[in-house]
Amino acid sequence: MAGAGGGGCPAGGNDFQWCFSQVKGAVDEDVAEADIISTVEFNYSGDLLATGDKGGRVVIFQREQENKGRAHSRGEYNVYSTFQSHEPEFDYLKSLEIEEKINKIRWLPQQNAAHFLLSTNDKTIKLWKISERDKRAEGYNLKDEDGRLRDPFRITALRVPILKPMDLMVEASPRRIFANAHTYHINSISVNSDHETYLSADDLRINLWHLEITDRSFNIVDIKPANMEELTEVITAAEFHPHQCNVFVYSSSKGTIRLCDMRSSALCDRHAKFFEEPEDPSSRSFFSEIISSISDVKFSHSGRYMMTRDYLSVKVWDLNMEGRPVETHQVHEYLRSKLCSLYENDCIFDKFECCWNGSDSAIMTGSYNNFFRMFDRNTRRDVTLEASRENSKPRASLKPRKVCTGGKRKKDEISVDSLDFNKKILHTAWHPMESIIAVAATNNLYIFQDKIN
C-alpha cells in the first residue's frame, strides 16, 4: 500500500497509519535560539537527511542498513556528520550583522563516492563536499608518522608509502564559496536539472550561478524599481523545473507566481506564464494581502504541477492552467477568526514550507501547536498529526488530531483558543521513494514512517 514512491493513503484512513520512528534533539524546556532547526532536506536517494539550524550548523543523518534480525526494522537515521557551515559576520559598509542561520540546504545528485550540498545564510552560499576516509598513508621517506622530519643521516633505504586501514572518518570540506552577489536576504536556492548551475533568490533579484565559478553570477530577474517608494511586492521563493533546465518559477508577496523561460532573454523580466487566483471581493479584509503572500513553491517530481503555500492554505497548480489552482487545501482555516491577534504577535508573517511525497499523490505542510497536515490528492482525505514526545514509543501510531472552533468540545479535540503558537512546524521533508517523513519542531527532528502490520 505504501510502496515505492510513498504512495498509498498517506493522509490517513483505516488501511494506512503513520507511526513514530525517532526523535533527535535535546528535551530541554529552555531551547537555545542557536539550536532551532531552520531547514530539513533529504538527498536524492533518501539515505541522507540534512538539517540546518540558527547557529549555522549542518547535521547530516545517515540511514543505517535494515537489520534482518530485528522485526519491523526499517533502518534508522543516525548522525553521520556535523559541521559549522556559517559563522556570524558583520557588514561594515552597512553596519549590519549577518546571521549565521542556515536558510536553505540543497543536495546535488551524487556523481561519485562523495556527497555534495549547497547551504546558504542570508548572504553567502557554500558548496560542501562530504567524503569518507578509512585509509591513511604510512611509510614516508622524509617524515615520521607524526609529521616530524626524519634525520637525513638515518635514512638508509628508500621506502614506498603504503595505505593502512583506519577508523572511518567523515570529512566536510568547503569546496566553493559564492559571496557578494546579494544585496538583500537570500530566501531560496535551487539546483538545476543540468547539475551544473543553480539559482539563488533574494527579495528583489534572482541570480544564476555555475557550480564551478564563484566570482560571477548572472542576474536573471530584477524587480527592484528605480524608486524604492514604488516597491509593491517582493520575491518570496524560487525553484527550477525538475526536468526542463531553462524553466524556473518564482513567487511573490502578492500571491502570484511567475514562470520564466531563460531561452527567451538573458534578463527574464517578462514571464512566460503568470499564475494568480482571482480574489473574492466579498472576503477582502485588512489581512488579505498578508495572508495571500506565498511562503513556498515546489514543483512536483513529475514537473506537471507546482504547489504553493500561503498562510492559510496549500494550492496545487497545473502548469497548463494559469487562471486558478486545480486544488486548494485548507491547512488551518479555523485561524481566520484569529488573524488580528496573529498579526499582533507577528505569527501571521510565519513562513511555512510544503513538500510532495515521492509519487506526487500526497502533500504535507506544517501548522501550529506542533501539528502538521497531510492531504491525499487521490482520495481527497486529509489528516492532522502531532509531533510530540508524549507519543514517542517505538512504532506508536500517531492519532489524528482535531481542532474545534466553538461550542462543545469532544474528548479528543483541542480548542482553537488553547493552541500554542510558539510551537510551530515550518519545515518538513518527505523521503523521495518511501513513506518516511522528517518534521522539524523547534530544536527537535521527528522521523515518522508508515506502520508495518
Curated annotation (Swiss-Prot):
Q: What happens when the gene is disrupted?
A: Mice are viable and were born at the expected Mendelian ratio. Mitotic cells display increased chromosome scattering, associated with in the presence of enhanced phosphorylation and perichromosomal loading of Mki67.
Q: Which GO terms describe its biological process?
A: cell division; exit from mitosis; mitotic cell cycle; regulation of chromosome segregation
The record ties this protein, via Gene3D superfamilies, to:
YVTN repeat-like/Quinoprotein amine dehydrogenase (2.130.10.10)
- Statement: the UniProt record of this protein carries the keyword Repeat: yes
Care to name a GO molecular-function term for this sequence?
enzyme-substrate adaptor activity
**Where does it primarily localize?**
cytoplasm
Output the Gene Ontology cellular-component terms: cytoplasm; protein phosphatase type 2A complex
Tell me the keywords, alphabetical order.
Answer: Cell cycle, Cell division, Cytoplasm, Mitosis, Phosphoprotein, Repeat, WD repeat
Cross-referenced PROSITE patterns, in alphabetical order? PR55_1, PR55_2
Where in or outside the cell is it found?
Cytoplasm
List residues, modification Phosphotyrosine: Y305
Q: Which residues carry the post-translational modification Phosphothreonine, per the record?
A: T308
Instruction: Give residue numbers for the modification (Phosphoserine).
Output: S285
WD repeats (start-end): 32-71, 97-138, 181-219, 230-270, 289-327, 344-385, 420-452
Source organism superkingdom: Eukaryota
Q: Which cysteines are joined by disulfide bonds?
A: none
What is its quaternary makeup?
PP2A consists of a common heterodimeric core enzyme, composed of a 36 kDa catalytic subunit (subunit C) and a 65 kDa constant regulatory subunit (PR65 or subunit A), that associates with a variety of regulatory subunits. Proteins that associate with the core dimer include three families of regulatory subunits B (the R2/B/PR55/B55, R3/B''/PR72/PR130/PR59 and R5/B'/B56 families), the 48 kDa variable regulatory subunit, viral proteins, and cell signaling molecules. Interacts with IER5.
Per the record, the similarity remark reads: Belongs to the phosphatase 2A regulatory subunit B family.
What does the UniProt record say this protein does?
Substrate-recognition subunit of protein phosphatase 2A (PP2A) that plays a key role in cell cycle by controlling mitosis entry and exit. Involved in chromosome clustering during late mitosis by mediating dephosphorylation of MKI67. The activity of PP2A complexes containing PPP2R2D (PR55-delta) fluctuate during the cell cycle: the activity is high in interphase and low in mitosis.
Q: Which PANTHER family match?
A: PROTEIN PHOSPHATASE PP2A REGULATORY SUBUNIT B
Q: What is this protein called?
A: Serine/threonine-protein phosphatase 2A 55 kDa regulatory subunit B delta isoform
Please tell me the species this chain comes from: Mus musculus
Name the gene for this chain. Ppp2r2d
